[in-house]
Amino acid sequence: MPKHAQVKPHLLYEWDYEKGIIKPKNKRCPRCGSFMAHHLKPVPRWHCGKCGYTIFEK
């Protein structure tokens, strides 16, 4: 059994074949630059697992 789950690119990126652009679906962390996770419970927020930066939504 692998230690980590395989990354599924179709869940992380959006493709625009007409323009030839690939964009990430999630936000980037302003502090370290890695992808942020969107959590809905208990409070909606964006959180960076690498550096701990959190953005709370209103």
Swiss-Prot record:
Could you tell me what the cofactor note in this record states?
A: Binds 1 zinc ion per subunit.
**From which residue to which do the C4-type zinc fingers run?**
29-51
Can the keyword Ion transport be found in this entry's annotation?
A: no
* Key words, A-Z: Metal-binding, Ribonucleoprotein, Ribosomal protein, Zinc, Zinc-finger
Q: Which domain of life is it from?
A: Archaea
Q: Which GO terms describe its biological process?
A: translation
Binding sites annotated in the UniProt record for Zn(2+):
29, 32, 48, 51
Q: Give the required cofactors.
A: Zn(2+)
Alphabetized GO MF terms: structural constituent of ribosome; zinc ion binding
Q: Which SMART domains match?
A: Ribosomal_S27 (SM01402)
InterPro entries documented for this protein: Ribosomal_eS31, Ribosomal_eS31_arc, Ribosomal_zn-bd
The answer to keyword NAD applying to this record is: no
Q: Which GO terms describe its cellular component?
A: ribonucleoprotein complex; ribosome
| NCBIfam families linked | PRK00432.1
Oligomer and partners: Part of the 30S ribosomal subunit.
HAMAP family found in the cross-reference section: Ribosomal_eS31
Q: Which family does it belong to?
A: Belongs to the eukaryotic ribosomal protein eS31 family.
**What is the designated name of this protein?**
Small ribosomal subunit protein eS31
Q: Which gene encodes it?
A: rps27ae
